[in-house]
Regions:
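Glycine-rich phosphate/ribose-binding loops and adjacent secondary-structure elements
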Residues: 217-390
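Flexible, glycine/charged-enriched surface loops at secondary-structure junctions
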Residues: 140-142, 242-249, 311, 420-430
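A structural motif
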Residues: 134-135, 174, 267, 336, ...
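Hydrophobic faces of well-ordered beta-strands that scaffold small-molecule active sites
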Residues: 108-111, 135-139, 155-159, 175-179, ...
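Mobile "lid/hinge" segments at catalytic clefts and subdomain interfaces of large enzymes
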Residues: 178-180, 186-208, 374-387, 413
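Conserved, well-structured core domains of diverse proteins
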Residues: 1-108, 112, 117-131, 135-136, ...
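Hydrophobic, small-residue-rich alpha-helical packing segments that form membrane-like cores
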Residues: 165, 187-189, 194-215, 219, ...
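Gly/Ser/Thr/Ala-enriched C-terminal appendages of enzymes
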Residues: 323-328, 332-454, 459-472
């Protein structure tokens, strides 16, 4: 059976062997609700008898950083000269309790992606690029890869519910520890690695049968609530002599409550992963119908930290859909201390390369469709464990491309900060932006472009009260 039929890919063969669905009928013949994608989805489920699985992220359009724009300096404020005035990017994470906080040369990190979801070459390339950039990279479900540790100057070690590949010795080898309680692509569920990627090496590292789907548990065996999480964090601190910062990573769901509980448990850093976050494999239904967007989650998280009076003391890293320097700048302006990238780094490395178009088509996909990652047949050699495919990925070239991309992303971030008159990217603030949509204005509390009115619920309530008071006074 072809890969698309096995995995439930878009363009699954029908009973005649033809791929896909007939041409879309005219709008008057078929209501918009029952469009091509919906029909194809139903046909696929009817063929497979189960939900569909894909890699990548949601395809839905949600409120995002693109709905905000910067308003740079002109006459009322002075911008900085890019060629002679510095704009600082140095970022410190985890100084709340750790003796050795993480010091980044720029407010960007590489998100957790496992050896298993990615090839050994891809993981090593990420570590090499991060070292040159002066930023951190992160392990993933399945433990620490020796080559990744050697390549990475700053490595964050994830502690996950599965305990796959977990080694107490690796805690001391890491530069920071990240307790993962969820991710934006599939909050409320555990990790998923399809059997096609469970090679002999992966099976040995995770103590699993070769070629069998691996479904990670969703709840940590060591704690069942925030009080237990506090005990776990203290155990991790003791195991590392109180040197390593402890992060808590969560999917963007009940953000305010979760943030407050994580802070109470002693987290030094919160990593908040929004709906747009990608993954190696997930049920499609979770990608499209769970979690809240990154921008919305960030605003709620900042508000929660402000209520606890720990904004700035507990650092906030956001991920999910960060694709360029403008997204990073807007996240920092809204209150984040740093951003984390995953899909952007893999794309820079060479994922979805058009030169492999024929192979994508044979699998029922198009180049640029990162939902192929779960199949284990990624022709670029990035999201695969097939030796002949991995051999296509040149280690040095992959690392160089990630280095170039993040360097360019940093220049974009600095350019926007200078245009707003800021000598440090962390000085960006909401006042430097305007909202381009009503939704974005309501979510962020930033005035709609062309107005000075903040379309937030509190502001609307105050405005209504003012009008009512004015009406009463006029009547009197």
């Amino acid at each position: 059976m072809e890969g698309s039929a096995v995995t439930g890919a878009r363009g699954v063969p029908d009973e005649t062997g033809a791929r896909g669905v007939p041409d879309e009928p005219a709008p008057r013949d078929r209501p918009p609700l029952w469009n091509r994608d919906v029909v194809e989805d139903i046909w696929t489920k009817a063929t497979l008898g189960r939900y569909r699985i894909q890699g990548g992220a949601t395809r839905l359009r949600v409120p995002c950083f693109d709905d905000l724009t910067f308003v740079p300096c002109t006459l009322s404020r002075l911008p900085l000269e890019g060629y002679r005035e510095r704009c600082e990017t140095r970022t410190i994470l985890g100084a709340r309790n750790a003796a050795k906080p993480i010091v980044l040369e720029r407010p960007i990190t590489i998100a957790g992606m496992s050896y298993g979801a990615l090839s050994k070459t891809a993981k090593t390339a990420l570590g090499m690029a991060a070292t040159r950039l002066g930023i951190s990279t992160t392990t993933g479900d399945g433990g620490m890869l020796a080559e990744e540790r050697e390549a990475s100057h700053l490595l964050v070690y994830q502690v996950l519910p599965s305990r796959y590949g977990f080694d107490p010795a690796h805690l001391k080898m890491a530069d920071a520890i990240e307790v993962v309680v969820g991710q934006g692509a599939k909050p409320g569920t555990g990790g998923l690695l399809l059997g096609a990627k469970v090679s002999p090496t992966i099976a040995a590292q995770r103590t699993l049968p070769e070629g069998v789907d691996q479904r990670s548990p969703v709840r940590h065996p060591d704690f069942i609530g925030p009080d237990d999480l506090q005990i776990k964090i203290e155990e991790l601190r003791e195991a590392t002599n109180w040197e390593k910062p402890v992060y808590v990573k969560m999917g963007a769901s009940r953000v305010a409550d979760d943030i407050k509980l994580a802070v109470k448990a002693g987290a030094d850093v919160i990593v908040l992963d929004g709906l747009e976050g990608a993954t190696g494999a997930s049920p499609e239904i979770l990608l499209d119908h769970t979690a809240i967007p990154t921008m919305s989650a960030l605003v709620e998280a900042v508000r929660a930290l402000e209520e606890l009076r720990v904004l700035g003391e507990v650092q906030l890293v956001v991920s999910g859909g960060i694709k360029h320097g403008a997204d990073a700048a807007k996240a920092l302006a809204l209150g984040a201390d740093a951003v984390s990238i995953g899909t952007a780094a893999l794309t820079a490395m060479g994922a979805d390369a058009p030169r492999y178009a024929d192979e994508y088509h044979r699998l029922g996909y198009e180049p640029g469709d990162s939902s192929i990652w779960h199949t284990g047949l990624d022709p670029t050699g990035i999201a695969t464990q097939e030796p002949e495919l991995e051999a296509r990925l040149d280690l040095e070239e992959a690392a160089e491309r990630v280095f170039n991309f993040v360097s360019a992303m940093t220049l974009e971030l600095q350019m926007l900060a200078r245009a707003c008159g800021k000598a440090d990217v962390h000085d960006l603030e909401p006042e430097d932006m305007r909202a381009l949509t009503l939704e974005a204005s309501v979510i962020t509390g930033i005035p709609l472009a062309g107005t000075d009115f903040v379309l937030s619920p509190d502001a609307i309530a105050r405005r209504v009260a003012e009008l009512l008071d004015k009406g009463g006074s006029d009547g009197a």
